[in-house]
């Protein structure tokens, strides 16, 4: 379970970086050269999703829980926004959903 969660976390970081870099270009006037690492991050994101031993839809559903937590971590660390009790509660619920889905992978 820990290996799966860490893999989902790495996957989420790649997806967030792959979305954040073009955001910097479009919203903040950063160089369009950021599209090069964007493409690499998104390609790595897709590849990482293929490393899970479950059906793709089940992987995407479980991944969503870790993505929510990673995005909130990004909100705190990169954007400098303090998390609210609602953020923490939502992250806990999303992570519980991910754990339930992953626990059932071998039983499906």
From Swiss-Prot:
Protein's UniProt keywords contain Ubl conjugation: no
- List the InterPro entries hit by this protein, alphabetically: UPF0060
Where does the protein end up? Cell inner membrane
* Main subcellular location: membrane
Indicate how the chain sits in the lipid bilayer: Multi-pass membrane protein
Highest rank taxon of the organism: Bacteria
Alphabetically sorted, this entry's keywords are:
Cell inner membrane, Cell membrane, Membrane, Transmembrane, Transmembrane helix
The record's section on HAMAP family has: UPF0060 (MF_00010)
Q: Which family does it belong to?
A: Belongs to the UPF0060 family.
Q: NCBIfam families, from UniProt?
A: PRK02237.1
Alphabetized PANTHER family for the sequence: UPF0060 MEMBRANE PROTEIN YNFA
What is this protein's name?
Answer: UPF0060 membrane protein KPN78578_15550
